[in-house]
Amino acid sequence: GGKSRRKAIIVLSDGIDTAVRDIDREQMANLPDDQIPSAIKPETSDILQRVLNKADRQGVTIYPLALPTGDPAKLADPTLRQVAMYKAARARLQIIADRTGGVVNTINRLEEMGTLYAKVAADLRTLYTIEYQPINEKRDGKWRTITLETSDTALISRTKTGYFAK
């Protein structure tokens, strides 16, 4: 087989997408305070699903570098709604990384960026590609979950969480 090049995207972001933030804000608009922490379901964002579907089709691994400005713990005098939106934003970055086989790295100080980029580059150089033929040959467009495990404790097993059977 020929050697194929790995496709990866490094996303430098606080995770706060203004379009999604406005949708999150609408979801919480008339809720009492006790319902705010669980009001936003990060995985249900249409925008997030479009990003994930495109990444799936392109075979891209996404590595979010999370800026400190998106850390809910660093908000000055935050409201319940702000904390909920920032937590949802961080959760979306994690969902993107998990789904595409990447890793979220959190930047605490801007001086760390070079080290984090180097960490992603090292990760890309040490990944192995494993292919398999599924037993279920139906191309029904349904989501199929993947689990990869290794018995060698020196190895780290990380994979996309699944694929659409097309």
Per-region residue spans from a language model:
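Scaffold/interface architecture of coatomer-like assemblies
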Residues: 1-166
